[in-house]
Curated annotation (Swiss-Prot):
Family membership: Belongs to the diphthine synthase family.
Name of the protein this chain belongs to: Diphthine methyl ester synthase
This protein's UniProt keywords: Cytoplasm, Methyltransferase, S-adenosyl-L-methionine, Transferase
Binding site for S-adenosyl-L-methionine: 9, 85, 88, 113-114, 164, 222, 247
Record's GO cellular component terms: cytoplasm
UniProt xrefs under SUPFAM superfamilies: Tetrapyrrole methylase
Gene3D superfamilies attached to this UniProt entry: Cobalt-precorrin-4 Transmethylase, Domain 1, Methyltransferase, Cobalt-precorrin-4 Transmethylase, Domain 2
Gene, per the UniProt record: DPH5
NCBIfam families on file: dph5 (TIGR00522)
Domain of life: Eukaryota
Role played: S-adenosyl-L-methionine-dependent methyltransferase that catalyzes four methylations of the modified target histidine residue in translation elongation factor 2 (EF-2), to form an intermediate called diphthine methyl ester. The four successive methylation reactions represent the second step of diphthamide biosynthesis.
Keyword Methyltransferase in record: yes
Gene Ontology process terms (BP): methylation; protein histidyl modification to diphthamide
Subcellular location: Cytoplasm
Source species: Candida glabrata (strain ATCC 2001 / BCRC 20586 / JCM 3761 / NBRC 0622 / NRRL Y-65 / CBS 138) (Yeast)
Length: 298
């Protein structure tokens, strides 16, 4: 049996009772270690808590060496641990498909993730649209396909959750080209860098999906003891120091509910200004009034 087990957001004890029982019954335990990190627990602490050795599964192992993970899973129990919920990344869906192709039974044990815990910032979950990912820009690569999704969300008044890039056990282009197994230090995108990249792409595309004054909410270390939120404009949060990772961001939709706004005011330095920014943004992105079609005369 292959178990895909969600670990939750932060603590070693965030795993569910059913998930913990499954881990204890597994021969091998893998921890996916490149789409997210467990902020309040180390590998060693997890091993002590589970009473099991934990094998770190980097991108290369999961995407290219899945046969190693699935080895003998038709005869013994193998656990694949994922920070958050198991289906927070398409890679994990692919692992399930490979297991099923090999006739290996699969059981998924869910947990909290940023996709639902984001509601703790005060925005209502059913007012969210498509989620986007913001990657680190390079000199030669500045992807902007996410921009269209932000535009679509904003047109129908929905908030956009932005997941920020992390780089764990990544190689530089030079080391890859030379075949050197030398890895760069871990990097975690900050709220400020995300906002700077948002502004850069809006300037480039100039389609007015948002402006520098569009309200956003910065989320830091969600689910951890030092969880914090910051509400302001994209321009303001482009200079905001949110502290230690992990970070994420929400771009407000143009139809923010009054209860959402009241909640967000607790996270801003200037309540009156933020209120006015929200009102101005809603007017800025207000669609043209609907005009009924002219009926043709007989």
């Amino acid at each position: 049996m292959l178990y895909l087990i969600g670990l939750g957001l932060s603590y070693k004890s965030d795993i569910t009772v059913r998930g913990l029982e499954a881990v204890k019954n597994c021969t091998r335990v893998y921890l996916e270690h490149y789409t997210s990190i467990l902020m309040a627990a180390s590998k060693e602490e997890l091993e002590e808590f589970y009473g099991k050795e934990v094998i770190l599964a980097d991108r290369e192992l999961v995407e290219s060496g899945s046969a190693d993970i699935l080895r003998d899973a038709d005869k013994e129990n193998v656990a694949f641990l994922v920070v958050g919920d198991p289906f927070g990344a398409t890679t994990h869906t692919d692992l399930v498909l490979r297991a099923k192709k090999d006739k290996i039974p699969v059981e998924v044990i869910h947990n909290a993730s940023v996709m639902n815990a984001v509601g703790s910032c005060g925005l209502q979950l059913y007012n969210f649209g498509q989620t986007i990912s913001m990657v680190f820009f390079t000199d030669s690569w500045r992807p902007d396909s996410w921009y269209d999704k932000v535009m679509e969300n904003r047109k129908i008044g929905l908030h956009t959750l932005v997941l920020l890039d992390i780089k764990v056990k990544e190689q530089s282009l030079e080391n890859m080209a030379r075949g050197r197994l030398i890895y760069e230090p871990p990097r975690y995108m900050s709220i400020a860098q995300c906002c700077q990249q948002l502004l850069e792409i809006e300037e480039l595309r100039a389609e007015k999906a948002y402006t520098a004054d569009t309200p956003v909410v910065g989320i830091s270390r969600l689910g951890s003891p030092t969880q914090s939120f910051k509400a302001g404009t994209i321009k303001e949060l482009a200079e905001y120091d949110a502290g230690e990772p992990l970070h994420s961001l929400v771009i407000l939709g143009r139809q923010s509910h009054e209860l959402e706004l009241e909640y967000l005011l607790e996270f801003t330095d200037n309540k009156e200004k933020f209120k006015n920014d929200v009102i101005a943004d809603q007017e800025y992105f207000k669609p043209a009034p609907w005009v009924p079609p002219v009926e043709e005369e007989d």
